[in-house]
Every structure is written in structure tokens, then in C-alpha cells.
């Protein structure tokens, strides 16, 4: 027996070497080697020489196809004939199974070596399998599908399509075998099948989901990619079989084919309304490109759930909040207030995006929506105001006034948010707010200085014009809130009322001593004479700032350098070196 096994092994090794040298002659070499193996003397009856021959033929076929993948069909056919002629096959040996294994190996190796011809080779192998004696090829076909999915996932779709076309009854089993063997190939496999044999798409996708529930979404996505017209039917069937996966299915379909996402998700939501918000949220998170279309469709079908869906989608993906808000305005404007409040309650960034989209969609209703949002989340007042200013700039001033009236405590945040979003319009917006609510001027001024320092000068000018009596107090509040903006603020308040230049400068310096130099520089922008008076008064009140005042004014207006230096030095002789 040992001698027989050694002889058979030696023969197989020689055959392998010969095939490596001349792949095209693989079948002929196999035939000659089988004759040699048949002539090995003194082989015990219990030794399975037929099995050795079949295994050798399988290995030779695989090796030959790897070397010449274009000849795969011819090699497999010729090798099948050689295997059919193997003598003395025992009843226990599964020659049909060995032939099927050889065929599967050939298909797999060919798919790896030449992906472009994978479908053609798979079709030829299915024909070869059909000629294998015996009627139990189902398991072998499924094994072949699994083997290909593992080794050549990129060709899985094309190969499954060909295999399903050749044997429709096995489509589901082959699809689930592929998905189970390589989950990453589930979507491409279903796409190929759905394109090649559309009528089998739903059945095969369902088979995948039954075998591997976690792949339901990928199966649905495959159908959507390969045959969009069947996407809704497949998604419904899969969600019906596995309700817990509804959101995943909706998201995968939307990601695979955004164009059909709204139609598919709407059909699923109609079948299972309780899961609509979860589906919408999953789409927003995993397929944001389809979020607005899906939201519009779902909300137009069920306006009463618009707020819930909007909130769920914005929470799942804050970056999609603007699109979702736009969908609310288009599909369910009657739910806009509730939806706006629900979205604002999530976080400030969502509130800003939603406010912007809603204000742009309906500027006339922006004030009411902003008020509803601010009531839901007062801490987001600045972001809501900024969003409104972005979305409806022409109505920003009126909306700012109404927001401050609705919540006076938020006046600073509203002013700051508006000014930061639209610095060029800050003057008009802040002026309107100051005129409407004189008692809140200081708060308004503070908000702008802190959140939009670049707009502080324009805002101060507008406030001084709207309420001259409160201008100096407002300027002082702004300087205290943001000393770095003091120069623009001082220039604006003094330009608005030159007669009170000295009073304004000293009041601001008292509120923000560290900004004395900037205040003097601001005064110098308007009137150098006033700047000297203001600088002198500030330095007398705070001699330690003399050097800072001199340097800041000189940097702003070099022509005044000598004069301001002299004045400061005379006020503080001991600090002349510092000056």
C-alpha cells in the first residue's frame, strides 16, 4: 500500500511539473498519467487509486487554468472527459462531487486570473456541471458560488447573475451561500443577480436575509443598484421579514441608489409607520445625499410626524439639519414651528442650520419660527439669530427686534449672533434693536462687542444715532466687554457726537482702563485735537497709562507722535523714559 501511494504521488507530481511546462496539454498529460497509474502493480484492493486519479486531474485542471485562464472552458471539458474514463471507481467514491469540485476550482481560478471573463467562464462551468451524472448538484453549485465570493468578490455579481440565469431554482441558495462566505460581497452579488435575472431579485435577497439577517440592508442595496425598479418590492419584503432591520435597509438602499431612496423609504414607511422616524434618521446618517428627498417625501405623506422625523434626522446627522429644515418648509409648512423647536432643542449648530434654511424658504414666517426655536432652546439664541441673518438678510433687522421683544434676556445674544453673521448689515440691525428697546442698549452693545468685534464700530454708530443719550454708556459697556475693539468703538461714538468727545473717551477709559491708548487712537481718527484733550484727561486720571497712550496714538497717527509724547511726558515727568 505504501509503495502504491508513493507511486501515485510521484506520478501526480510529475504530472504537475509537466502541466507547468505545457498547460495546453493538461488533459492529454492527465490521460497518459492515468494510464501509468492504472499500470502500477500490486495495488491492494482497498487502495483508492480512482480517487488518486480524480484528485490529480482536479489539481492539474486548476493549475492549467491559472496559467491559461482563457482556455478554462476547454480545459474543464477535456478534464471532465478524462475523469469520466477513470476505471475501477468504487461505489463509495463520489466522482460527481469530485467533478463538481474541479469545476468550481476552475471557475474560481479563472475569475481571479481574468475578472473580465469571469461571467463567461462561470456560464461554461454551469454547462459542465449540468453534464455531470447524478442529480444532486445543488450543494455543489452553492459551494462554487461561495468559493468565488471568497476568492474573487469583485466578480461575484456577474458570476451570480450567470449562475442564476442558468439555474433559476438555485438563485436564492447560491446568493445566500455567497453572502455567508463573504459578507462584503453580498451587495455586489445581489446587484449582478438583480440586473441579470430581475424576477429572481426579491427571492434571492430574502434568502440572504433569512440566512444572515445582519446582511438584509446590503441585500436590499444590491437590488437597488442592479435593478432600481425592484428596489421597493425587495426592501418591503426584507423589512417585513426582519422589522428590526428596517432602518438599516432604508439607509443601504439610499446609499446605493439615492435617486430611488425617497420612493423606497416612503413605501417602507407606509408599511411600517412606527419605524418611519428611525428610517429617516438612518438615511440622514448614512446616506446624507438622499436626506432632503427622503424627508420631503415622508413629510408630505405624513405631515403630523414631520417634527419627529426632522428631530430624528438632525440628531442623527447635524450636518444634514439644513436640508431637513428645507424639506419641512416644502413638504409640511404647517409643521414648521413644531419642527423648528424640536430641532433647536438638539444643539446650537443644528438650530443655526435649521433657522437659516427655514428663513430662506419663508422669510415672512422667519420671526415666528425664530421665536419658537428660541423658546425651545434659549441658550442657542445667538446661533438662531445668525442662522436667520444668513437665510433672510433683508428681514434680519425686523426679526432681531421681534426676537429681543420675545426674550429681552437674550438681546445680547441676538445682537451678537446677527452682527457676526452679517457684519455689513450690523449697523442697521443693531440700530433697529436699540431704537425698539432703549433700555437694552447696553446689553445689545455688549453682545456685539463680544461676538462680532469687527462690526463693533458700525454697531456703535447706529446705536448713537438711534439713541444719542445712551451712546456713551453703550460705548463704555462695549469697551468693557471687549477692550480690543475700543478704537473702532471710540471713533464711532465720537464721530456721532463730536461735542462729547472728551466725555465719551474718559467714560470709556474708566470702564476699560487697559484700552486707554486705543480709545485715544480712535479719537485721533476723528479729530486730533480731541484726541490730545482725551489723552491728557486719561493720562491725568491714570498716569501709569501715559506711555501706552502715547505709543498707541503715535502708531495710529505718526504726525501726532511728537505732540502726544510731549503732552504725556509733561503729565508724568517721572515716566518720561516710558513715554
Task: Label each PLM-derived region with a short phrase.
Residues 1-579:
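General marker for long, soluble alpha-helical cores
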Amino acid at each position: 500500500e505504501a509503495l502504491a501511494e508513493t507511486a501515485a504521488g510521484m506520478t501526480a507530481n510529475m504530472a504537475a511539473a509537466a502541466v507547468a511546462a505545457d498547460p495546453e496539454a493538461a488533459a492529454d498529460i492527465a490521460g497518459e498519467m492515468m494510464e501509468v497509474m492504472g499500470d502500477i502493480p500490486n495495488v491492494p484492493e482497498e487502495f483508492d487509486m480512482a480517487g488518486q486519479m480524480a484528485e490529480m486531474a482536479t489539481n492539474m485542471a486548476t493549475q492549467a487554468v491559472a496559467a491559461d485562464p482563457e482556455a478554462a472552458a476547454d480545459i474543464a471539458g477535456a478534464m471532465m472527459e478524462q475523469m469520466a474514463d477513470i476505471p475501477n471507481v468504487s461505489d463509495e467514491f463520489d466522482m460527481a462531487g469530485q467533478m463538481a469540485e474541479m469545476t468550481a476550482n476552475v471557475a474560481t481560478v479563472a475569475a481571479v486570473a481574468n475578472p473580465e471573463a469571469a461571467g463567461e467562464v462561470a456560464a461554461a462551468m454551469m454547462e459542465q456541471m449540468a453534464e455531470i451524472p447524478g442529480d444532486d448538484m445543488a450543494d455543489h453549485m452553492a459551494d462554487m458560488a461561495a468559493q468565488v465570493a471568497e476568492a474573487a468578490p469583485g466578480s461575484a455579481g456577474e458570476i451570480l447573475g450567470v449562475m442564476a440565469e442558468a439555474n433559476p431554482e438555485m438563485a436564492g441558495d447560491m446568493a445566500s451561500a455567497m453572502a455567508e462566505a463573504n459578507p462584503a460581497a453580498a451587495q455586489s452579488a445581489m446587484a449582478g443577480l438583480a440586473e441579470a435575472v430581475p424576477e429572481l431579485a426579491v427571492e434571492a435577497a430574502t434568502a440572504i436575509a433569512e440566512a444572515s439577517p445582519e446582511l438584509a440592508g446590503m441585500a436590499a442595496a444590491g437590488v437597488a443598484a442592479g435593478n432600481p425598479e425592484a428596489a421597493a418590492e425587495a426592501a418591503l419584503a426584507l423589512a417585513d421579514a426582519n422589522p428590526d432591520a428596517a432602518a438599516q435597509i432604508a439607509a443601504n438602499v439610499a446609499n446605493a441608489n439615492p435617486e430611488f431612496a425617497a420612493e423606497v423609504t416612503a413605501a417602507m414607511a407606509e408599511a411600517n409607520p412606527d419605524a418611519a422616524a428611525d428610517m429617516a434618521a438612518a438615511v440622514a446618517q448614512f446616506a446624507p445625499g438622499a436626506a432632503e428627498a427622503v424627508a420631503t417625501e415622508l413629510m408630505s405623506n405624513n405631515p403630523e410626524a414631520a417634527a419627529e422625523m426632522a428631530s430624528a434626522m438632525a440628531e442623527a446627522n447635524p450636518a444634514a439639519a439644513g436640508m431637513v429644515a428645507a424639506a419641512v418648509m416644502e413638504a409640511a409648512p404647517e409643521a414648521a414651528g413644531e419642527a423648528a423647536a424640536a430641532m433647536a432643542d438638539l444643539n446650537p449648530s443644528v438650530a443655526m442650520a435649521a433657522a437659516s434654511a427655514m428663513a430662506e424658504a419663508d422669510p415672512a414666517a422667519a420671526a415666528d419660527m425664530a421665536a419658537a426655536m428660541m423658546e425651545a432652546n434659549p441658550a442657542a439664541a445667538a446661533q438662531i439669530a445668525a442662522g436667520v441673518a444668513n437665510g433672510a438678510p433683508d428681514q434680519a433687522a425686523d426679526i432681531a427686534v421681534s426676537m429681543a421683544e420675545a426674550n429681552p434676556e437674550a438681546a445680547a445674544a441676538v445682537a451678537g449672533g446677527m452682527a457676526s453673521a452679517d457684519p455689513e448689515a450690523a449697523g442697521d440691525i443693531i440700530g433697529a434693536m436699540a431704537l425698539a428697546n432703549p433700555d437694552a442698549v447696553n446689553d445689545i452693545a455688549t453682545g456685539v462687542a463680544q461676538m462680532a468685534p469687527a462690526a463693533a464700530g458700525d454697531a456703535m454708530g447706529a446705536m448713537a444715532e438711534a439713541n444719542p443719550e445712551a451712546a456713551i454708556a453703550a460705548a463704555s459697556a462695549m469697551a468693557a466687554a471687549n477692550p480690543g475693539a475700543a478704537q473702532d468703538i471710540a471713533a464711532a461714538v465720537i464721530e456721532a457726537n463730536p461735542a462729547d468727545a472728551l466725555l465719551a473717551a474718559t467714560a470709556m477709559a474708566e470702564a476699560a482702563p487697559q484700552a486707554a491708548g486705543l480709545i485715544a487712537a480712535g479719537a485721533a481718527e476723528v479729530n486730533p485735537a480731541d484726541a490730545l484733550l482725551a489723552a491728557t484727561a486719561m493720562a491725568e486720571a491714570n498716569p501709569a497709562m501715559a506711555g501706552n497712550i502715547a505709543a498707541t496714538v503715535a502708531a495710529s497717527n505718526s504726525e501726532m507722535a511728537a505732540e502726544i509724547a510731549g503732552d504725556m511726558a509733561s503729565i508724568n515727568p517721572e515716566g518720561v523714559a516710558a513715554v
